Amino acid sequence: MDFAAIRNAAEAYKPAMVKFLRDMIAIPSESCEEEGVVKRIAEELKALGYDKVEFDKLGNVIGWMGEGDKIIAIDSHIDTVGIGNIENWEADPYKGYETDDIIYGRGGSDQEGGMAAAAYGVKIMKDLDLLPKGYKMMVVGSVQEEDCDGMCWQSIVNEYFNGPEDARSKIEFVISTEPTDGGIYRGHRGRMEIRVDMHGVSCHGSAPERGDNAIHKMAEVILNVRDLNENPADGSTEINGLVKMLDPKFNPEHYEDARFLGRGTCTTSQIFYTSPSRCAVAD
């Protein structure tokens, strides 16, 4: 494989890739509001000469290149989280800016930059006759990943394959274009969302001892979650310290897999509460 030719082709496409990425950044595309950006992606894929460009029932945009019974899939989720308080941004998140080193704006890294790389990467493969024989390249711009991770590919599997087993038999492997600082990561342990509910007894805030404050009870859980993520090996307990998953003493069956993937992480991402009023103990 001529890596110099690949680099030269990428350099030649750089202005077009930059424009494509900045166009995507300029289109607000929070989860469930991706219509504008998926249409822009479809336009680019068609202009690049993809054999087929289509949308599935959920709204994912899919570009196909090459011929064959086996598939190599490249996924980029193209929805973003919100911008929060725009005053906290150093530049308009939907205009952004570019320097010799970065392209700044909402979604530039997570993950519309990956979409630009995937779209042009497969185009370069076609230009240089690097498409593998017997394989189709499946380039996916997936939606609603930020809010409901996995639903986008569940839709694809159900619509284009006869269930998960059929998908596994036809898709040779999947490349995720999540940002990695240019590293190649060969595995992922997956993701889990856990909801924890705490209930208390409300009372007037002037006499909190008469109630049972659900916020205080939840605070203990939140601190334990923090400790679970942050405790070093020598500070781990039977509960706290995810680093223990790497130790055969505590994880004899799966520690080798854990070492390959690296230790897991966890965090608290949302808190909700109910209370009759701001002067009452939360229940």
Task: Please describe what each predicted stretch is.
Residues 2-104, 108, 127-135:
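Acidic/His- and Gly-rich active-site-bordering loop/insert found
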Residues 36, 83-85, 149-151, 185-186:
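Short glycine-/acidic-enriched loop or helix-start segments at secondary-structure transitions
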